[in-house]
Amino acid sequence: MSDEKYNAKLDQAGGKLKEGFGKISGDKSLETEGKVDKVTGKVKEVIADAKDTVKGLAKGLDNKDK
């Protein structure tokens, strides 16, 4: 797992915790912030996956030429 993907997963986990604490405490602002953090983490994860895919394709094409 790349560092980018690892950090994205941490962002998602942190967001889930914030959202949960917001729900428990009745703090809608914290709950919303947690939801935003989860979505941001998911977007970062998708971008990291896309980068890994492109790197893999480039490596495969490079090996094909040899």
Swiss-Prot record:
This is UPF0337 protein SPy_1261/M5005_Spy0972. Belongs to the UPF0337 (CsbD) family. Pfam families: CsbD. It comes from the Bacteria.
